[in-house]
Amino acid sequence: MRTPTPALIFISALLLVGNWASSARGADQTSTQLDELVVTGERTGPGMWHVHRGSAHLWILGSLSPLPKGITWRSKQVEQVLGTTNMVLVPKPLEIGIVRILWLLLTERDVLMVGGGKRLKDVMPANLHERFALQRTKFTGDSTKWERYRPIVATAFLQQAAFHQVGLSARLDLGAAVRTLARKHGVRIEEVKIAGVGDLLDALKTMQPATENTCVEASLVTIESDLPRLIDRAEAWATGNVERIENLREPAEVDACLAALDAGSAAGDLIARVHRTWLESLERRLQSGGTTLAVVNMDMLLGRGGLLDDLRAKGYEVDAP
């Protein structure tokens, strides 16, 4: 099954320590500014998949992360579909305010920080820390930053810094933009809850050091050598080139991380549950008839065992963009 990349876990760690902008605010205009520069100007993003059987129609807009910082997203196709839609499905944002952040840092310090008076270099394998330190200096100019955080959290911060330097952002929320458009069209919105703070804490609490190191390795490979692929993928999304996105395969280290997470950990359970929750939500809307628009991460949609394959297996017709 094609699952969300290890960035899901890294980003979750970022959410927990408050380095993530709340995605619930949305935008006030139909043309939604997604941030600041790899591709500039107004872009439509990819077309939508059309899943249907009988009188039931499901339009799926594939989201992606990271995306170019400097594009303005606007899709006339989305606006047209909203004119005939009964319901919009979007991921429920995980909101953490400053009070929650402080509470987490006080009560869950052992989950997020190294602890015991140690530093990152004391708990991370020497070869990984050497690579981490090299990239940290390259992207931040700071030789001591994040030394008190556990490896997966520190690497998450570094990954976001690298994204920023190359003109990408993982903070851009297509769901929030579609949520705003749905309100303007008077369309009902259903938020699909995929994870809560407790789920993410459990995933971090139960993650074994060997699994953590495997996923840190995957993230470091992303930072060291995979940024060009991510830039290419982000540009393909902005220009609507779905075939290009499908052909840009992830490094083997990412697959190794996913395999480690799947080996009975709470993180693996969380990833599987996210997939199952989305499939159940999409099928429920199809069974209810009418027209639904959903915003779903492309990593969950595409490839063997993705949500589109699941829907085909259940007898639904799936038309590509």
Task: Describe the predicted segments one by one.
Residues 260-321:
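A cross-kingdom marker for long, charged
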Residues 31-41, 45-266:
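Structured, acidic catalytic/metal-binding patches in enzyme active sites
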Residues 8-19:
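Bacterial N-terminal signal peptides
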Residues 23-26:
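Boundary at the C-terminal end of the N-terminal hydrophobic targeting segment
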Residues 1-6:
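Positively charged n-region of N-terminal signal peptides that target proteins for export
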